Amino acid sequence: MWPLVLVPVGLVLHDYLKAPIDRLYFQNPRRPLVGMRNTIIDIITGFSNYRVLDHPGLWLIKFHFRKIQKEFGKVSKKLEKQYFHDLDPWFEKNDNYYFYIAENFPLLKNLIDQIPCINKETALFAVVEGPMTIAPHRAETNLLLRYHLTIEGGGDCTLYTEKGPHVHKEGEEYLFDHARYHELTKTGQGRRVVLILDVHRCF
């Protein structure tokens, strides 16, 4: 009997103890349930290296990189900036960190609509101007992976994950589990623009 009781405890602890530890974890009564699911997904998938080609149609994003880049340069100038600190109070107020929703870019929206593994509701361009750091953090759920395609970047911005560093260089893509540790450091004065997509896992 006792071993059976310890199973859910072990599942929750596996998720809770991932770095960085979320001190507010148990303030949300649903979080331990999500944590058990996260651990089961970790067991099923292992500590995988995620490949774009394993997700149907996702390769089309980088294939159309130049068109996406050109559309961003043209359309973003006409749009109002939306700030991450308004979206989520976890972010400190920073007018140099903002985003544009992907649905305001017709070519990109049409492309995303053709790719079933992409979560259509969260697609956006994230912009960082000047030096900046984003502290270590992780998402609450690992049902989705995160995809980055660097639209603008001179190599002065690095995303650190458990897999090691990924430098945001123009035209390069990266797929990772954002429910595990990641942080960002940008040292230069230039602008970094990344297309961020949440991608459904392929089990």
Language-model segment annotations:
Residues W2-R138, L143-L144, G154-C157, T187, ...:
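Fe(II)/2-oxoglutarate oxygenase catalytic core
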Residues E129-M132, K163, R180:
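Short, well-ordered turn and helix-capping elements at secondary-structure junctions
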Residues H148:
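Zn2+-dependent peptidoglycan hydrolase active-site motif and core
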Residues V167-Y181:
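Conserved metal-binding segment of the jelly-roll/cupin
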